[in-house]
Each structure stands twice: as structure tokens, then as C-alpha cells.
């Protein structure tokens, strides 16, 4: 528990104090967000607001993780783990992609950054490296950071994504990892359209996974093989990362809440999406994340529906997509949309936590 508190606290402090420094830096250099003319007119007032605030989030999570593991080493609790470092690397890689995208937008002074091909190749390369490495580094019990089985609350033994191994199985597994990484990184990116929306929603998810990973640690099959125990390689280090994500997003939210003084940009949204994806893989809860992160799923689904219906029927289901802009277009105030979407995110987290704990209770009683 000490490690979790340290990680969350350090991440929060780094984020909340670094963000205003970034605000001053970008403001003094007149480096601000460009807003599309064809978008909502109410958003034009945000033109020039500093962006790339995700730097503070990434710094908070990274420093919180490093400080915690250095403390753990000297306290005799162990130190860095393969699972934690791989997820951190995934987050940093996608954050770098987002940074390049944001930098190009600011340099060219238009709301278009990396082209789709460059962003796709970057996400693909990062996901493939992550996918190849998560099946390596077995611990003393033979557990690797991830398994080839599809996971809900724990591995589903009857569904082996890699078909037992081989070249074809490896390719299928890597495709699966790419889909997970791409889906969550783009989902958070799409959700980041209103002041505080993505930061708040991600904070709820990270809070849930701090509890989930800590519960997996307390009931690990490594310490006691009993009904309901979890075969997760490094649950405590996963909880440390999730706590860092919680602290960093809350620290950033202090400045990003409406009216936002700074935006996280693609630097932050892609990094946080990578964190969400990575944690779901190494905690072996990919399908559970769909419930806990349901708000992000709704946002992506609204875009997919809008595009599909428009291309097939030439009509629009929503005034604008993603769906948070639809509600703005029909007259909801931005803060109203954000708070109500936060409530949806909270309900999704509660539902996911209930399913997770219910599974443990069911097995523990057997």
C-alpha cells in the first residue's frame, strides 16, 4: 500500500506543479491550439489555449513510478518489474507519437498534425514491440507479463488467441495487441474534446485499476494457491502505475477543468490510451476494461455509427460526432455535458468493479 500512495502522491504533485509552468511557457511563445472553423462556434474562444499539457501527465506518471520503485528497492520490497516497464514504455512511445503530432500542429499553425499513414505506422510499430515483449520475461513461476489467452477477469482457458503458438499464432496475437492498443489510444484521443472530459474519465478508470491490481496482489496465486486467486505476473507494480495515472490526471485536471487553461493534446491522450491498453493486457482483463472504460467505447461507437450511416445512407445520426459534440450542438452547456459524461464513467466503473468482485466472491465460496 505504501508504494501505491507514494506513486499517486508524487504523480499528483509533479503534474499539478509542472502544468502551470507549461502554461506560462507556451503562452509566452504564443503556442496555442488551433480550432477548426467548421466546428462548434462556441469552441472558437478556445483558440490559442496552450496544448501539449500531456507532458505534465507523462512526467507525473513516470517520475511517480521511478521514485516508488527506487524507494521499494532500498526498503527491501523489490523493484522494477517487466510488466510495469513494458506498460510504461508503451505509454511513453505513444506519448512521443502524440508529441510529434502536437508539435507539427503548432509549427504549421493549423489543426492538422501527423498524417494518418505516419500515425498508423507509429502506433503499429509501438504495439508490435509491446506485443512481442509481453510474452517474454517469465518469472520464477513461469508467468509472463501477458498470456495468449483472451481475458475477461482472468484468462479464458478455452480461447487461445495464438492457437497454441507457431508463426500464425504469433501473428494473430500481435494483431490482437495492435487492435487493443490502437482502440484505446484512439478512444481516449476522441474523448478529449471538452474541458476536463478525458482527464476526469481516465482518472476514474485508473482509480478502478489501482484497486483491481492491488486486489490481485493481495489474492495472488504466487503467495497462496486458493480459490479465486489471480495468475498475474506483477500486480503490485501494475497498481503503482495505475495510481500514478490517477494522481497525474487529477493534478492536470486542476488546470484542465472548464475553462481550461491548457489542453493535454495528443501527447496526453495517446499516452493515457496506451496506459489503459497496457494495464488491461498485463492485468489480464482486456474484456473487463470494455465495461470499466464504457464511456470511451460509447465515444468511439458514436463516430463509427456516424461514418457508417453517412457512407451507406448519406444521413447523419448525430448533429456532430463524437457524441459529446452532439449534445453541445443540441444546446447543452459544455460543463453539463462533461459532468453528465463523468457520471456515465463513474457508473461504468462501479459496474465493472461489481463484476470483478462478484467473480472473486463466486469462486471464493466454491
Swiss-Prot record:
One GO process term, biological-process aspect: cell wall organization
Keyword entries, A-Z: Cell cycle, Cell division, Cell membrane, Cell shape, Cell wall biogenesis/degradation, Magnesium, Membrane, Metal-binding, Peptidoglycan synthesis, Transferase, Transmembrane, Transmembrane helix
Source superkingdom: Bacteria
Record EC number: 2.7.8.13
Reaction equation(s) it catalyzes: UDP-N-acetyl-alpha-D-muramoyl-L-alanyl-gamma-D-glutamyl-meso-2,6-diaminopimeloyl-D-alanyl-D-alanine + di-trans,octa-cis-undecaprenyl phosphate = di-trans,octa-cis-undecaprenyl diphospho-N-acetyl-alpha-D-muramoyl-L-alanyl-D-glutamyl-meso-2,6-diaminopimeloyl-D-alanyl-D-alanine + UMP
Alphabetical list of CDD domains matching this protein: GT_MraY
Disulphide bonds in the chain: none
GO molecular function terms attached to this record: metal ion binding; phospho-N-acetylmuramoyl-pentapeptide-transferase activity; UDP-N-acetylmuramoyl-L-alanyl-D-glutamyl-meso-2,6-diaminopimelyl-D-alanyl-D-alanine:undecaprenyl-phosphate transferase activity
Subcellular location: Cell membrane
Pathway in which the depicted protein is active: Cell wall biogenesis; peptidoglycan biosynthesis
GO CC terms, sorted: plasma membrane
Membrane topology per record: Multi-pass membrane protein
Predominant cellular place of this UniProt entry's protein: membrane
Membrane-crossing segments per the record: 3-23, 55-75, 80-100, 118-138, 161-181, 197-217, 238-258, 262-282, 290-310, 341-361
Cofactor(s) this protein cannot do without: Mg(2+)
Role, per record: Catalyzes the initial step of the lipid cycle reactions in the biosynthesis of the cell wall peptidoglycan: transfers peptidoglycan precursor phospho-MurNAc-pentapeptide from UDP-MurNAc-pentapeptide onto the lipid carrier undecaprenyl phosphate, yielding undecaprenyl-pyrophosphoryl-MurNAc-pentapeptide, known as lipid I.
Similarity field: Belongs to the glycosyltransferase 4 family. MraY subfamily.
HAMAP family to which the protein is assigned, alphabetical: MraY
Protein name in the entry: Phospho-N-acetylmuramoyl-pentapeptide-transferase
Organism: Corynebacterium efficiens (strain DSM 44549 / YS-314 / AJ 12310 / JCM 11189 / NBRC 100395)
Lineage: Bacteria, Bacillati, Actinomycetota, Actinomycetes, Mycobacteriales
Gene that encodes the chain: mraY
Amino acid at each position: 500500500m505504501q508504494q501505491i500512495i507514494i506513486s499517486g502522491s508524487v504523480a499528483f504533485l509533479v503534474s499539478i506543479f509542472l502544468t502551470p509552468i507549461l502554461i506560462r511557457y507556451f503562452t509566452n511563445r504564443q503556442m496555442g491550439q488551433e480550432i477548426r472553423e467548421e466546428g462548434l462556434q462556441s469552441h472558437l474562444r478556445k483558440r490559442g489555449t496552450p496544448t501539449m499539457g500531456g507532458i505534465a501527465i507523462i512526467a507525473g506518471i513516470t517520475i511517480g513510478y521511478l521514485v516508488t520503485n527506487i524507494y521499494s528497492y532500498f526498503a527491501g520490497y523489490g523493484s522494477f518489474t517487466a510488466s510495469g516497464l513494458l506498460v510504461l514504455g508503451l505509454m511513453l512511445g505513444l506519448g512521443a507519437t502524440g508529441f510529434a503530432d502536437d508539435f507539427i500542429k503548432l509549427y504549421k499553425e493549423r489543426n492538422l498534425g501527423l498524417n494518418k499513414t505516419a500515425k498508423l505506422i507509429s502506433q503499429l510499430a509501438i504495439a508490435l514491440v509491446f506485443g512481442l515483449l509481453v510474452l517474454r520475461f517469465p518469472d520464477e513461476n513461469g508467468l509472463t507479463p501477458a498470456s495468449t489467452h483472451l481475458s475477461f477477469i482472468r484468462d479464458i482457458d478455452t480461447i487461445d488467441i495464438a492457437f497454441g503458438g507457431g508463426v500464425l499464432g504469433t501473428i494473430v496475437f500481435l494483431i490482437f495487441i495492435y487492435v487493443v492498443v490502437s482502440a484505446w489510444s484512439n478512444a481516449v484521443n476522441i474523448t478529449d474534446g471538452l474541458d476536463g472530459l478525458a482527464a476526469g474519465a481516465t482518472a476514474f478508470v485508473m482509480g478502478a485499476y489501482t484497486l483491481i491490481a492491488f486486489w490481485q496482489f493481495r489474492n495472488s496465486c504466487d503467495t497462496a494457491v486458493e480459490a479465486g486467486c489471480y495468475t498475474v505476473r506483477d500486480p503490485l507494480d501494475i497498481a503503482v502505475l495505475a495510481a500514478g495515472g490517477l494522481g497525474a490526471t487529477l493534478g492536470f485536471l486542476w488546470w484542465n477543468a472548464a475553462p481550461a487553461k491548457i489542453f493535454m493534446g495528443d501527447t496526453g491522450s495517446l499516452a493515457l490510451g496506451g496506459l489503459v491498453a497496457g494495464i488491461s493486457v498485463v492485468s489480464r482483463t482486456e474484456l473487463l476494461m470494455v465495461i470499466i472504460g464504457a464511456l470511451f467505447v460509447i465515444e468511439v461507437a458514436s463516430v463509427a455509427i456516424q461514418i457508417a450511416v453517412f457512407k451507406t445512407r448519406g444521413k447523419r445520426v448525430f448533429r456532430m460526432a463524437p457524441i459529446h459534440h452532439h449534445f453541445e450542438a443540441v444546446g447543452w452547456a459544455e460543463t453539463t455535458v462533461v459532468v453528465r459524461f463523468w457520471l456515465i464513467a463513474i457508473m461504468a466503473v462501479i459496474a465493472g468493479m461489481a463484476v470483478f468482485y462478484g467473480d472473486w466472491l463466486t469462486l471464493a465460496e466454491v
